[in-house]
């Protein structure tokens, strides 16, 4: 079973993840990133949305989906992404691997500098919690594009 989550806060501002929906129809090849992205697209209809949304996929050590959550939304010029929620979701869902996915509503497959910045920040969050980063992807009507991880700073050696 695969769950779709959101983060809720109680009266003391303590976070917990809440199950929005549960899906029993996991993808046939649940360890293939491509089949997982197509599965996410079928559940969220990402490629047809008129606005941009950012999702996190949580995986176990065998790279099977544990769950997913929307962590940001916006339009082409600006997207509000809540990195606090990303960290909480990864920790509270028990993620051992994670993937970040977003859509481009204007059917643009090329990555922007903001997409590269998102990929870098997500990689930093994964490194902080010792979670393997499975990549960053863009879903559009034209197809799926992977954003290369590139060369990022190793913050442990910067003084």
Question: Positions of the model-derived regions?
Answer:
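Extended substrate/RNA-proximal surfaces in nucleic-acid metabolism proteins
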Residues: 32
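Mobile, glycine- and charge-enriched loop segments
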Residues: 36-79
């Amino acid at each position: 079973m695969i769950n779709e989550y959101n983060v809720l806060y109680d009266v003391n501002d303590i976070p917990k993840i809440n199950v929005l929906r549960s899906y029993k129809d996991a993808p046939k090849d649940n360890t293939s990133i491509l089949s997982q992205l197509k599965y996410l697209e079928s559940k969220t209809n990402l490629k047809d949305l008129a606005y941009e949304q950012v999702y996190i996929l949580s995986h176990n050590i065998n790279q099977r989906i544990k769950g997913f959550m929307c962590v940001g939304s916006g339009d082409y010029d600006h997207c509000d992404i809540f990195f606090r929620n990303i960290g909480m979701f990864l920790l509270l869902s028990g993620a051992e691997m994670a993937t970040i996915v977003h859509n481009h509503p204007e059917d643009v497959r090329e990555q922007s500098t903001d997409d590269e910045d998102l990929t870098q920040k997500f990689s930093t969050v994964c490194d902080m919690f010792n979670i393997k980063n499975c990549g960053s992807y863009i879903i559009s009507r034209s197809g799926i594009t992977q954003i290369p991880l590139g060369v990022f700073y190793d913050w442990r050696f910067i003084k």
